[in-house]
Amino acid sequence: MIQYPRYKQHRFSSFQVIIAGFAAVDLVGALLLMLPIAAQQRCVTPFHEALFTSTSALCVTGLVVQDTGSYWSVFGQSVILLLIQIGGLGVITVGAAFALLSGRKISLKQRSTMQEATAAPQMGGIVRLTGFILRITALFELVGAALLLPTFCADYGLHGIWYALFHSISAFCNAGFDLLGTEEAKFVSLTRYAGDPLLTTVIAALIVFGGLGFLTWEDICTYRLDLHRYRMQSKVILVTTAFLLVLPTLYFYCFEFTAGSARQRILLSMFQSVTPRTAGFNTADLAAMGSTSQALMVVLMLLGGSPGSTAGGMKTTTFAVLLANMWATFRRREDAEFFGRRIDGSAVKNAATIAGMYLTLFFLGAFVIATAEQLPMSVCLYETASAVATVGLTLGITPQLGILSQGVLIALMFLGRVGGLTLIYAAFGSSPAHSRLPQEKIAIG
């Protein structure tokens, strides 16, 4: 009797499924953007430019090599908007939404993947959470579009409806894509509306709301103002977000935007403190800002939004955990603490790992681009921070970069969006080791 060898079936982890899902959608988006119908001139867009745009949209970044408003047709803009929406919600969440709408049962494996994709604390209630994510997203985007309608319809007529919807989704998903460029004035973002309090406030609010995280919004909608019932994570996110909004606003108001009326200075300062985390819109000339302000924006870009949100970056909780651990070390305490709760040691390790990974990608990418393009390192650091944190702000060099440098930015955007732990666990597995080696002390500092 002939015995055939048995082949062990390879089971993909949840983290590998998330990465594969993003990569597949990214490639399909690039192929659609290459079609002649996607460009206003009905030309075939080079693959590397289509892939760059698709990655930027799916990873809700906003860096572009072609002006979105003047280069892409309505079809191309629609593809970009769809990619933004998928990227903001997450490929797995969108897939789960279609499964729920079609009446299919969600398997245990699929629930596990959904849990990882949404940064939910447990698998229980994940289907209900997915439904909540879809409802809250639709609510914010539709209300935002309605508030933007008067401004855009006054300037663009009936086309203003499309502009309002596009910019509302782009803002809530922290994407930073805009349609305001023309053949005569490309890559202008929201600079022409810098003095418009309604538009800048609505866009800024959508950016903040999208960056808070869906679990935080679940607490807000469930417990209203009963703050002591919020998850510790939600409290940390709200406090850290407020800290990262107020202090940069004060700095920009006092030291950067010193000309103009008080209202103009407040609007500019507020918006430029919001948009680096991690939207990509701008109402000021970024290249004209002082070097200290640009450095502050790089820091804000790297910190990013909150876990389980539409934003990218290292995340506010990573920053908060590192600060709490540093404070505990100063006080010779064994554990970091928040709001009367002890932080698990694994969270501190993960925070340090994520911060180290983002900083490594940030510096390494800038080094490669600076070498390849012969550009100042400071400009390249700004660009790579924007890419790896999926922000979309630039000092104007993106369209002029060569294919190698564009490839570096594509990789940084993709790696930044799928997340640090997702990458680590997909590559090395998420199962803890069952054996431990002998311990020995090492001097630190």
What are these regions (language model features)?
Residues M1-G445:
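Membrane-proximal intracellular helices of multi-pass ion channels
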